[in-house]
């Protein structure tokens, strides 16, 4: 999906997560700054989301073809209202594959947005690496609440991982009134 701007892109990804699919969006520093308020929305609504930041050089539009690793503070602290978010950083193109899997695992296991940092070099580079056997990875199944639990539905109830239930809109018996 090609959105008209950065804000629409992240809001569409949040909508995908709200509907029961994992939303993913990407940009670089200036675009990540524009996505900041919506990141806070995803944190507040406890929706899984992966945000990829391919860092580039300079402030503002800067040097779009120059790589730089200067967005760490933006990734860690770049939201208002004490809105913490896990941040993962890839060290190579092959590592980006592993980091993406970890970002998805954290996002769905803890119902939170995750930032995946990369840079222009990693985003444009290639390296030989064997695609791993995915059956060797530990599964992290996504579980949706499909029926009203005993004692009623508590949207902000927590499990042993402090995760709230993920409910698809329109699930019978789990509708907001």
Model region roles, listed by residue range:
Residues 1-75, 86-107:
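Thiamine diphosphate
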Residues 29, 69-72, 84-85, 153, ...:
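Generic secondary-structure boundary/loop-capping signal
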Residues 99-177:
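Flexible, low-complexity linker and terminal segments
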């Amino acid at each position: 999906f090609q959105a008209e701007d950065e804000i629409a892109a992240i809001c569409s990804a949040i909508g995908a997560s709200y509907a029961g699919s994992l939303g993913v969006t990407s940009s670089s520093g200036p675009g990540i700054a524009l996505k900041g308020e919506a990141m806070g929305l995803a944190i507040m609504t406890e929706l899984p989301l992966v945000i990829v930041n391919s860092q580039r050089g300079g402030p503002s539009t800067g040097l779009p073809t120059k790589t730089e690793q200067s967005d760490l503070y933006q990734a860690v602290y770049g939201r208002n209202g004490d809105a913490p978010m896990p941040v993962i950083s890839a060290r190579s193109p092959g590592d980006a594959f592993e980091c993406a899997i970890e970002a998805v695992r954290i996002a769905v296991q803890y119902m939170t947005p995750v930032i995946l940092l990369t840079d222009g070099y990693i985003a444009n580079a290639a390296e030989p690496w064997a695609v791993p056997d995915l059956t060797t990875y530990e599964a992290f199944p996504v579980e949706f609440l499909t029926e009203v639990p005993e004692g009623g539905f508590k949207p902000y109830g927590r499990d042993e991982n402090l995760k709230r239930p993920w409910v698809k809109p329109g699930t019978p018996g789990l509708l907001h009134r």
